[in-house]
Each structure stands twice: as structure tokens, then as C-alpha cells.
Amino acid sequence: MLRAETKARARALQMLYAWELTGNLPMSETATRLARLTGPDPLVFDRAEALATGVVAAADSLDRETEAAADNWRLSRIGTVERNILRLATYELRLGEEPPKVVINEAVQLAHWFAGAKAPAFINGVLDRIAHSLGRL
């Protein structure tokens, strides 16, 4: 059984993916559409929407931080799923509400579930650099 926080991260990733693919609709609209498709889970949904909304608000600075930590990778070369996992985890690392190892491990788990075979190692490396640059590790 997955923890509520893990489910919220997975749902936030789905919201961010949908947000990016739909041309950056307001997050509230993206979240509502996703809830209609997947069914409500208020505890998970509220946390996921809060995370996704925070990521969207800080997307430009999160992207700059990711690109700086992703050696020789422009953001445009990083897949949509991977890019949004990195945004979400970087946002959480900045918030400082969870231990950095938890944030990184959960991001790697999301990569295992939703991204390609090489994504988990890439995500882990980039987030390790970001966590160090933020003084979290």
C-alpha cells in the first residue's frame, strides 16, 4: 500500500504532465479535469494540487536550477515526464518540509513508474547536485 504522500506526488506529476501537454491551462482547471477522469481522493488530491500549483508558480526558476545541475543537458532535451519529476522534487527540496533523501528516493521511484529505463539514474544524479547546491545534503 502506498503512503498518501507518495500518491500525492504521483498525482501531482500527472497534473504537471497534463498541464504541460494542454498548453499550460490554469492548474485548477487541469486538476479538476484530472479528478473527473481518475475519481476523487480528497486527501491526496488537495496535497497534489498544492504541490503542482507551487511547481507551476516557480517553474521558470526550477527549470533554470535543473538545467544548471543537468550537465550538458538543455531542458528541451529532457523528456516531459522526467522534466516534471525534476521540477516537483526540486520544489520539494526548496520547501524543506521532507528530508532530502525522502524527496530524492520518491522522485527516483516516480521515474521507475512513469519514465524510461535510464531516467531513475539521471533523476538521482541531477537531484543530488541540486540538493547539494541548496545545502540540503
Q: Which residues does each predicted region cover?
A:
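N-terminal interaction/assembly modules
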Residues: 1-137
